[in-house]
């Protein structure tokens, strides 16, 4: 392999590792708590549930007119904290620290502005594929 082949090999290895990392089946809460109207397509027409899960995506064919294979909600430290931002119920105050939020036994995520950063957890009993 010549000097021009080495960068290509690096790209192939990086893409392969990225594919392996993304091929993990998401948790049930990351899928079932996604509102159908907010689903972002992650597959192709006719994709099977196994193919979809192998892409690291969610699959639900029970709702017509929306993607059946879709990107999951973001991962959280606890399954109880996985939810759409519209479902967050405030558990703190503006500017609360992650430590103060945790002392209230609540979830913390400051990635999105103008929504509660400290919010009550939800039961995982309703999570399913």
Swiss-Prot record:
InterPro entries: P_trefoil_chordata (IPR017994), P_trefoil_CS (IPR017957), P_trefoil_dom (IPR000519), P_trefoil_dom_sf (IPR044913). GO terms for biological process: calcium-mediated signaling; cell population proliferation; chemokine-mediated signaling pathway; establishment of localization in cell; gastric acid secretion; macrophage activation; maintenance of gastrointestinal epithelium; negative regulation of gastric acid secretion. Residues 1-23 form the signal peptide. Keywords: Disulfide bond, Growth factor, Repeat, Secreted, Signal. One of its GO terms (molecular function) is growth factor activity. It is found in: Secreted. Disulfide bonds join 29-127, 31-58, 42-57, 52-69, 81-107, 91-106, 101-118. GO terms for cellular component: extracellular space. It holds the Pfam family Trefoil. This is Trefoil factor 2.
């Amino acid at each position: 392999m010549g000097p021009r082949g080495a960068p290509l090999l690096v790209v192939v290895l990086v893409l392969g590792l990225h594919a392996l990392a993304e091929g993990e089946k998401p948790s049930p809460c990351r899928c079932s708590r996604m509102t159908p109207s907010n689903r972002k397509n992650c597959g192709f027409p006719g994709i099977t549930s196994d193919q979809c899960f192998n892409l690291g995506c969610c699959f639900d064919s029970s709702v017509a007119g929306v993607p059946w294979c879709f990107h999951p909600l973001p991962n959280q430290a606890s399954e109880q904290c996985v939810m759409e931002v519209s479902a967050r119920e405030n558990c703190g105050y503006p500017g609360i620290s992650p430590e103060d939020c945790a002392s209230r036994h609540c979830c913390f995520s400051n990635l999105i502005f103008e929504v509660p950063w400290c919010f009550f957890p939800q039961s995982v009993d309703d999570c399913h594929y």
